[in-house]
């Protein structure tokens, strides 16, 4: 077990420096990043000269994305699979709590920091704002939910800063609580973290093959976050781990999930760090994880960010070139003033038509989200209705009091699956709608408009706060109670038959009356048992319906809020683009008018200035064309 505390950080840091070297992790090819930053700066300078503050803001945000990338990797899995130990061994630092109990109790975000640090992010207080409270590094080894620094407020997550070279290039690990323990959320709760993740590591030990919940989670996680791997842990404990890995690989192949499986041993990794043993480190197979993070995660995320930034630069240069080119054509041709009146009318008509065409995106977005909201809500209700019907059929086939734990587990798993499937489907439909809106701009001849990216936290949610299915009291009938029910039913039979038999001279209690009493008593007992079973089944069905209604109330609200947030994101994204396009067309017309009124003495200076700015924009575009085909270098994370 990796020790916790600041002293442990210092000791392990010295060991790491002796063994692996303090290799600095940087994004791949910093010189190429410098070229992109230089292109952004040149474009910003031209935008400022032309008083295009909107383009300056967009390019400034793009500059921040390219210079300070953060690649988020979610570590998820069932309870007791070795997730936290994997993270600690990967970083060579005690960044996450490890123990025999439920170690990770809240989400832990580990990112780079020159000095070890830790803080709690607390839930919103009475003023509606969250708070961050610094805590000693030693406290991450305790249950932070009860930390005195929280002041009784709910702890949303723990943010840990670790001086690990692996994190210096922008990697950030999100360690999630294990699933399956007392009070732990379903595996679908982790789905809410995946849309904001660049990769996912699904941790499963080699004691057994994938369980059904694990396979379901792997399939759904791959649909939301295609970049990921399965990490098979504890290979040092199970001699038959290779058979388990091969079986799990076959399961993934049948499920059509192209995720690699990396078998590792955190214990061997810890010993390798302690003993400065490179051969033991290779045997732990941790270099394979580092290679995966370097080649498949960090480099791909960097390429995706760069592609988006290059698109922003290209869009800005095109808009600036429209305005500058229009002005230059007028200034450079004095005879154009004679044709200015008719030409301006034509340009105005073209501008108005272009603006009207770009305005179609609002209709596409509005209609699309109305359909999406209705479809998602209908899909969720259909799934919940199916869960309810299946549960009622299961209840009708047994005694609920004897099988209530099994029924409750099946219902909760079915609800988690339904919520997760609906979540994934809504995410995919939202991405498709974003592409449809971008296509409406392309139909208007504006091919440089990029589709909005939905990968940030707008799709995130919290499925872990859903209440559990209520209990049902299982009280089997005692022998005495059964006798009372039978005697209550048999008494009438004994009296009735006894009185009839008294006509022929028999007593009240005779073989006929006793036999009739036994028959009627047995019938009364069976009828009471049947009524009791019907009553219990009715109560169980009502319990299930009430549970599903509660879940539907919470999840439907979360779904609507999530879709509204996506709609606002798309609306703001495309409204900003539409305003930029409209402004570019308007300023192009204004520049044409102003250029026609330029005095002869100022004409030459203005021509040179316009040619200089257009030349810079042309060089920027040439450099963009040269950068695009080479966006495939692999990031380097240093040695494992």
Swiss-Prot record:
Residue spans crossing the bilayer: 497-519
Keyword Transmembrane helix: yes
Signal peptide: none
Record keywords: Antibiotic resistance, Cell membrane, Coiled coil, Membrane, Transmembrane, Transmembrane helix
Domain of life: Bacteria
Location relative to the cell: Cell membrane
Primary site of residence: membrane
Parts forming coiled coils: 560-628
Subunit structure: Forms multimeric structures containing a central pore.
Job of this protein: Participates in the development of tolerance to both isoniazid and ethambutol. May function through a MDR-pump like mechanism, although it does not appear to directly transport isoniazid from the cell.
PANTHER family: SARCALUMENIN (PTHR43681:SF1), TRANSMEMBRANE GTPASE FZO (PTHR43681)
Name of protein: Isoniazid-induced protein IniA
Organism of derivation: Mycobacterium tuberculosis (strain ATCC 25618 / H37Rv)
Organism ancestry: Bacteria, Bacillati, Actinomycetota, Actinomycetes, Mycobacteriales
Primary gene name: iniA
């Amino acid at each position: 077990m990796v020790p916790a505390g600041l002293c442990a950080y210092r000791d392990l840091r010295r060991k790491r420096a002796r063994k692996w070297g303090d290799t600095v992790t940087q994004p791949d090819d910093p010189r190429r990043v410098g070229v992109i930053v230089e292109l952004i700066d040149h474009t910003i300078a031209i935008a400022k000269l032309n008083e295009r503050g909107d383009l300056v803001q967009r390019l400034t945000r793009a500059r921040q994305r390219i210079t300070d990338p953060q690649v988020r990797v979610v570590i998820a899995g069932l309870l007791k699979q070795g997730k936290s130990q994997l993270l600690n061994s990967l970083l060579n630092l005690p960044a996450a709590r490890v123990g025999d109990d439920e170690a990770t109790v809240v989400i832990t975000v580990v990112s780079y920091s020159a000095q070890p640090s830790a803080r709690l992010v607390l839930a919103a207080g009475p003023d509606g704002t969250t708070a961050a409270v610094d805590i000693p590094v030693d406290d991450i080894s305790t249950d932070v939910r009860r930390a005195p620094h929280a002041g009784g407020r709910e702890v949303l997550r723990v943010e840990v800063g670790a001086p690990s070279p692996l994190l210096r290039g922008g990697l950030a690990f999100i360690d999630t609580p294990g699933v399956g323990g007392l009070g732990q959320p379903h595996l679908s709760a982790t789905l809410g973290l995946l849309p904001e993740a660049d990769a996912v590591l699904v941790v499963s030990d080699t004691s057994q093959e994938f369980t059904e919940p694990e396979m379901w989670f792997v399939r759904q996680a791959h649909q939301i976050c295609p970049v990921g791997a399965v990490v098979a842990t504890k290979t040092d404990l199970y001699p038959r781990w290779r058979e388990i890995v091969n079986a799990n690989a076959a399961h993934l192949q049948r499920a059509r999930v192209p995720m690699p499986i990396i078998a590792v041993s955190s214990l061997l990794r810890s010993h390798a760090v302690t003993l400065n043993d490179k051969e033991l480190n290779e045997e732990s197979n941790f270099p394979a994880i580092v290679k995966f993070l370097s080649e498949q995660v960090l480099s791909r995320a960097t390429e995706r960010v760069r592609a988006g930034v290059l698109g922003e630069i290209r869009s800005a240069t095109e808009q600036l070139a429209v305005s500058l080119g229009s002005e230059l054509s007028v200034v450079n041709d004095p005879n154009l003033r004679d044709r200015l009146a008719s030409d301006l009318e034509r340009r105005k008509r073209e501008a108005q038509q272009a603006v009207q065409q770009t305005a179609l995106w609002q209709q596409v977005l509005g209609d699309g989200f109305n359909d999406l909201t209705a479809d998602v809500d209908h899909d969720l209700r259909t799934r919940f209705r199916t869960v309810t019907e299946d549960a009622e059929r299961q209840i009708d086939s047994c005694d609920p009091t004897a099988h209530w734990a099994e029924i409750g587990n099946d219902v909760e798993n079915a609800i988690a699956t339904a919520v997760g499937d609906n979540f994934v489907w809504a995410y995919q439909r939202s991405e498709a709608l974003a592409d449809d809106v971008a296509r409406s701009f392309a139909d208007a001849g504006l091919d440089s408009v990029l589709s909005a990216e939905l990968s940030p936290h707008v799709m995130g949610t919290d499925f872990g706060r859903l209440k559990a299915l209520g209990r049902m009291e299982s009280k089997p009938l005692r022998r005495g109670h059964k006798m009372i029910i039978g005697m209550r039913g048999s008494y009438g039979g004994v009296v009735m038959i006894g009185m009839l038999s008294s006509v022929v001279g028999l007593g009240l209690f005779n073989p006929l009356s006793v036999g009739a009493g036994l028959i009627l008593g047995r019938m009364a007992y069976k009828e009471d048992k049947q009524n009791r079973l019907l009553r219990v089944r009715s109560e169980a069905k009502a319990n299930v319906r009430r549970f599903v209604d509660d879940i539907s109330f919470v999840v439907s609200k979360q779904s609507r809020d999530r879709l509204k947030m996506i709609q606002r994101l798309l609306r703001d994204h495309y409204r900003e683009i539409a305003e930029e396009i409209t402004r570019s067309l308007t300023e192009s017309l204004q520049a044409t008018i102003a250029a026609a009124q330029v005095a002869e003495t100022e004409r030459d200076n203005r021509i040179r200035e316009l040619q200089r700015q257009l030349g810079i924009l042309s060089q920027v575009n040439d450099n963009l064309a040269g950068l695009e085909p080479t966006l495939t270098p692999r990031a380097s994370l240093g040695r494992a």
